[in-house]
Amino acid sequence: MYSVTTAGGSVPVIDDLDAAIIGLLHAEPRIGVLEASRRLNVARGTVQARLDRLHARGVVTGYGPDVDPETIGFGVTAFVTLEIRQVGGHDPVTERLALIPEILEVHTITGAGDMLCRVVARTNADLQRVIDAIVTAEGVARASTVIALATPVRYRVLPLVRAAARPRSGAGHSPA
């Protein structure tokens, strides 16, 4: 991995070895560095150095299990757009929303609303309870909710990682 300087500053760039390491870890999160180096046909130290850099730069942020909310009883997914009172800003609202376990993500957005939340619930009636908890959070002025009927493309980053990878420099060698 290396950096490219743009008008916005230095942007980390990954190469095809970084992408291969990330892809392997995505497919087999419990694989060890030694086994990864064998499968990728590179030195163990190279894989470890690349992983250390990917972690240090925030490209790889963890190895936790991916949990499908539906498999633990939360079969309803909805997106809630919030308009907030501008007096206190986003931070106090975000802190309150973070206390609601059914909120999986909160994004500040442009457009008609100020924040977008991805939430889950057990049933539609339970979704009403979650929405009630959201709209009673101090600073929330209005909420608009849409329920997801299906998720034909789940959250994924591996295609993006592959698209972002640049070919390694040199004849089969890359900087560790």
What does each model-identified segment do?
Residues 1-176:
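A compositional/biophysical signature of low hydrophobicity enriched in polar/charged and small residues
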